[in-house]
């Protein structure tokens, strides 16, 4: 049966995902940055209360995936911490300035991760050649690759995702970016073994007083009065589609 991974940005989201049938959680902070390394407090809380597998993301900042030596050193420390806390896997990715997988750094990541399952995230979609990148990641021992098929969303990139799947059984190709209940069946019919979804909604902040003339963000247009939340019904609907597909 296809596996359903839900992207969660808080303890509350993780509990919702677990209650509604998620098979695994990718744990992140900062949804507006596309996911950054969670805080130690969140990591410890989730590790204590969530029983399904949780893979924290290791990403020190938003933007591109070429990191300074200092940023990369911090990533390795975060990987060691995630390993010490007992998580079964993690999510990360590093590229060279030319858009190739940085194999030298991946070797260090794999050594720091040890027995943990490593997912190479959508840095893969920024690679110059996805098929060369996949071969390199297979050689590195990566467990899975999260990809939209190098398109804005996975529905548009499904043909490339299918080509990547055809390259072999490892790493597992996990489709993500815009995967929802209304298009999930297309991925299952295409033979995708794992899918990744935010299954989320933005809810208004409960703040009554709002200083409209001031922003805490460098982006003065940023909406600081909405909050991301996993929608339990969306997770349950997707899991139901997967179960019914398996029963055919």
UniProtKB/Swiss-Prot annotation:
UniProt keyword Chaperone present: no
Keywords in alphabetical order: Cytoplasm
Domain of life, per lineage: Bacteria
InterPro entries reported for this sequence: CutC-like, CutC-like_dom_sf
Gene Ontology cellular component list: cytoplasm
SUPFAM superfamilies reported in the protein's UniProt record: CutC-like
Protein name per Swiss-Prot or TrEMBL: PF03932 family protein CutC
Naturally occurring in which organism (per UniProt): Salmonella schwarzengrund (strain CVM19633)
Name of the coding gene: cutC
């Amino acid at each position: 049966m296809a596996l359903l991974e839900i992207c969660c940005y808080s303890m509350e989201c993780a509990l919702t995902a677990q209650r509604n049938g998620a098979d695994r959680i990718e744990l992140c902070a900062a949804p507006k940055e596309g996911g950054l390394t969670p805080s130690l407090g969140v990591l410890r809380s989730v590790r204590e209360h969530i029983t399904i597998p949780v893979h924290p993301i290791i990403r020190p900042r938003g933007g591109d995936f070429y990191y300074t030596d200092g940023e990369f050193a911090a990533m390795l420390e975060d990987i060691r911490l995630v390993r010490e806390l007992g998580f079964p896997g993690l999510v990360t990715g590093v590229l060279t300035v030319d858009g190739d997988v940085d194999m030298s750094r991946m070797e260090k990541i794999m050594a720091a991760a040890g027995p943990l399952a490593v997912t190479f995230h959508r840095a893969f979609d920024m690679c110059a050649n996805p098929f060369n990148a996949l071969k390199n990641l297979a050689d590195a021992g990566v467990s899975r690759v999260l990809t939209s098929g190098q398109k804005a969303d996975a529905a548009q990139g499904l043909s490339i995702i299918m080509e990547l799947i055809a390259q072999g059984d490892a790493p597992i190709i996990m489709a993500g970016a815009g995967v929802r209940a209304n298009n999930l069946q297309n991925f299952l019919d295409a033979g995708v073994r794992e899918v990744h979804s935010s299954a989320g909604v933005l809810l208004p902040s409960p703040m009554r007083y709002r200083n409209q003339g001031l922003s805490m963000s460098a982006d003065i247009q940023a909406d600081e009065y909405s909050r991301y939340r996993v929608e339990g019904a969306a997770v349950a609907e997707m899991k139901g589609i997967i179960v019914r597909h398996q029963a055919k």
